[in-house]
Amino acid sequence: MKIRCDVCDKEEASVFCTADEASLCGGCDHQVHHANKLASKHLRFSLLYPSSSNTSSPLCDICQDKKALLFCQQDRAILCKDCDSSIHAANEHTKKHDRFLLTGVKLSATSSVYKPTSKSSSSSSSNQDFSVPGSSISNPPPLKKPLSAPPQSNKIQPFSKINGGDASVNQWGSTSTISEYLMDTLPGWHVEDFLDSSLPTYGFSKSGDDDGVLPYMEPEDDNNTKRNNNNNNNNNNNTVSLPSKNLGIWVPQIPQTLPSSYPNQYFSQDNNIQFGMYNKETSPEVVSFAPIQNMKQQGQNNKRWYDDGGFTVPQITPPPLSSNKKFRSFW
């Protein structure tokens, strides 16, 4: 009786793998255990078929008297007919055991690990030895070599340049210069606007030394102030003449003491506030601060603002409320 391969079910099995629990022929054994390093470490036992001269059959493992006919996979024992019926008819669990007929084929006493051939011997598939020591099965037919894939070129194509300019463009058409990139992403702006520090930003420039502090413009002396007042009598403005050099942002300064009184002219008709410096000789003394409401009563016809060098915050009068509601001040 012969045992067929559990994989192809055509050829006669030559080895038994304990990890796969399957009988394999020579060709299937090479395909299964040559797949990876883990499969190559499986222990295999060669199948020893009985010879024609030796017809003695093994004895039962239970009674040790009669010839064994069956092999129980769960009990891992060979049983005779009587022992098999008494053991597997005991309950429902033993009835489900898998039993096989004995063919007289024995396993080798020693196991072997699959040893892949070297590179030199792999070139000639006809010289490969797939046999297991102690097996009488001849070498299987050689396997066909798989077709190799065509080699792929890893060359990088050089960048192409535009004939009409100096900007280099790659094969997908994207620009490589920073100026063209900024012109595409920020339309209306040029690279010179970001790089040229001499251009003023939004009409403001930095004057004087590069110390980050704006210059403070002092008023001129009394003689220069009188001379300027004589030239500007029609305008009634006491302004400070600023030098042409190192011209920066001029911030009006608040005097130490408030003027004693304000003139009758506070606001101009166009409601523009004029800034200047306070002069003791030309400006009257102010004792108390007059609110905005008194200013409106003093000059109704021709209102003009006379700058004394300080800031005056106008008071906002809330709209009149209805008669049934009380007036509430928010200030």
UniProtKB/Swiss-Prot annotation:
Binding, Zn(2+) 1: C5, C8, C28, H34
One example GO MF annotation: transcription cis-regulatory region binding
Gene from which this protein is expressed: BBX21
Binding of Zn(2+) 2, residues: C60, C63, C83, H93
Subunit annotation: Interacts with COP1, HY5 and BBX32. Interacts with FLZ1.
Annotated function: Transcription activator that acts as a positive regulator of seedling photomorphogenesis. Acts downstream of COP1 and play an important role in early and long-term adjustment of the shade avoidance syndrome (SAS) responses in natural environments.
Annotated knockout phenotype: Enhanced number of emerged lateral roots.
Protein name: B-box zinc finger protein 21
Record carries keyword Zinc: yes
Swiss-Prot/TrEMBL GO biological process terms: photoprotection; positive regulation of photosynthesis; regulation of DNA-templated transcription; shade avoidance
